[in-house]
UniProtKB/Swiss-Prot annotation:
GO molecular function: structural constituent of ribosome
GO CC list: cytosolic large ribosomal subunit
Gene Ontology process terms (BP): translation
Name of the protein described by the UniProt record: Large ribosomal subunit protein bL33
Keyword check for Lipid metabolism: no
Keywords from the named record: Ribonucleoprotein, Ribosomal protein
Family indicated by similarity: Belongs to the bacterial ribosomal protein bL33 family.
Length: 55
């Protein structure tokens, strides 16, 4: 079986609220860590989310 090109990642909030999103990314084309600005419902504002591992 071949290795999949897309992997699941966890986007952790930098506001230290414990909120996270789970998304996919192409591991071959996006080799660096993903940083996205998204809405944090706990902090009730837009913050940066950084990539982490799914446990």
């Amino acid at each position: 079986m071949a290795k999949p090109t897309t992997i699941k990642i966890r986007l952790n909030s930098t506001a230290d609220t414990g909120h996270f999103y789970v998304t996919k990314k192409n591991a071959r084309t996006m080799t660096e860590k993903m940083v996205v600005r998204k809405y944090d419902p706990v902090a009730r504002k837009h913050v940066e989310y950084k990539e982490g591992k799914i446990k």
